[in-house]
């Protein structure tokens, strides 16, 4: 949304003329971050040369550099940062010739990126969106009131340009920083899995869940405020319709709408991409577990065979009876020959045979409704049937009753689009929602 008053060749010539350059090796960047941290603890925002040397001494110690030349190297680093317009130097005659240093906007911007902007805060984002909502509402009210050119510039254009747009840029920057954080988390997970995936599983889970939670918090906060922001932008846009002299406001509103749409859209896309990556990591871990399990077993077996004469071993094989899964309806019970007669209570039947018998009985009982053209209240009929069977059979019997009932006819109330009332069908909380079948 920035409007450049110069062309690209003019900007290139300007940068060349002023000899703009930034060179920050790791130790110099650490020194700049140390200055920003110490500067943030001071009320006046000023630092003396001695304080800068002390900060450089801490950095030099962290990089395990020699202490003999700290003063010389600190002086060189300070002069270099002044030359690169990261620090401003002020000579004070009242301080015996000692200089006073302040961070420049460029220095603050760099350190702010590395320190403050990397800390995602839902509260901070909520406050930003609250300020944006207030500014947009105030601008929309001013646009509805109308006025002269000064009114539009001061009460509509200025808040949009210098408050709303800047906060949108800040939110966009937060999203881009989180993109980098996601890449950093991916690198951390890859490093953990390459070292020892067994020990890394819990750490990977923590990194994945934390990043997912942060992305979701950001997106929920944006979506909660997005509709109100768009509504106020539309109010301003409607107020500028028909005014040719207000084209600059209309263009600004369009740019703000596009940026807001892009922010919300990218937030959801980032969540979708992260979900895909999350599934990929879990699939990799499951595959690694299966492969490692088989590899360990094969390795142990191979070692046991190779070292048999040094460490003899015996293999005991047990042939146990096959276990039956009673939940599988298609499994047939084993019919081994037995001696003697079993009591009737111990005789078994396949569930498929019982189901066929029940279906035939229910079909025969329900035909009366079709032959006599009687309304079939499925809830009442089902309750009567379930009362005849134990609770363990209620689900299967209810399913059979529904299957047979829908074959007989339909309910005209189904075509009205109105939902049916829930009816209790047993004493254990089960309910059914169905209209009375009255058309066979």
Curated annotation (Swiss-Prot):
Listed GO MF terms: calcium ion binding
Keyword Cell cycle among record annotations: yes
Role this protein plays: Involved in chromosome condensation, segregation and cell cycle progression. May participate in facilitating chromosome segregation by condensation DNA from both sides of a centrally located replisome during cell division. Not required for mini-F plasmid partitioning. Probably acts via its interaction with MukB and MukE. Overexpression results in anucleate cells. It has a calcium binding activity.
Lineage: Bacteria, Pseudomonadati, Pseudomonadota, Gammaproteobacteria, Enterobacterales
Gene name of this polypeptide: mukF
Protein name stated in the entry: Chromosome partition protein MukF
GO terms under biological process: cell division; chromosome condensation; chromosome segregation; DNA replication
Keyword 4Fe-4S listed: no
Record localization: Cytoplasm, Nucleoid
Quaternary organization: Interacts, and probably forms a ternary complex, with MukE and MukB via its C-terminal region. The complex formation is stimulated by calcium or magnesium. It is required for an interaction between MukE and MukB.
